[in-house]
Amino acid sequence: MFTNRDEVLEKALRIFAKMNYEKASQMEIAKTCGLSKAGLTYYFPFKLDLFMAVADRYVFDTQHSKNKFNFTDGSLSEFIDQYIAGVENTMQRLVRLLDDGNNPSGCSFNFYYYHLLMQVRLYYPNVEQKIAAIFEQNHRLWKSAIHRAKENGEIRSDLDVEETALMFWQMFFWWRTMLLLRH
C-alpha cells in the first residue's frame, strides 16, 4: 500500500486528537498509516516533526482567515452571517476528517479537535506567536467590519471601533468555543 505525506498527516490528526501526544507512539502512528516505523520517519524523522506538521495544517492553516472565511463587502449583518458560516463550515470539515468510525472515548468529534488544540498549546514550540497571529487576524476582521458599519451608519457614530470590535470578537470566540464542545 502506498501512503503519501497527506495521508500520514490525516491519520496522525485522528491519533493526536484522540490520544495525548505522549501516548501516541511513532509505532502506532506508522501502523495506522500502513507503514513501518522507518517508513514514517522517511516523512517525519521525529514525532514532534509530525505533530507540528499536523498542527500547521489542521490548526494554523485551517484557522487562517483566508482559508476559513469568504467575505464580500456588505453590511455588518452580512459580515456576521459570513463569519458564522465560515466557523460552521470549518468545524464540519474538521469533524468529517476526525470521524473515521472510531470513537474510543465516546466524545463529540468537536471535542477531539478541542483536545488537539490543548495539546498544540502544550507541545508546539513557541506556539504563542502563532496563536497571537490568529487572534490578531480575527480582531482585524472585526475592526474592519465595525469600522465599515460605523461609516455606513449601521451602528452609532459614537461607538469606539476598537472596543466594539473586541466585544464582538470575544462574543464570537465564546460562541465558537461552545460550538467546539457541543455534542
Where are these regions (language model features)?
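Hydrophobic/aromatic residues within well-ordered alpha-helical segments
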Residues: 47, 54, 58, 62, ...
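Hydrophobic/aromatic-rich alpha-helical bundle segments in the mid-to-C-terminal region
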Residues: 128-136, 150-183
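Amphipathic alpha-helical packing segments from all-alpha helical-bundle domains
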Residues: 81, 105-115, 125-151, 163
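Hydrophobic recognition helices of helix-based DNA-binding modules
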Residues: 54, 58, 62, 66, ...
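Solvent-exposed, amphipathic alpha-helical segments
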Residues: 11-19, 65, 117, 167, ...
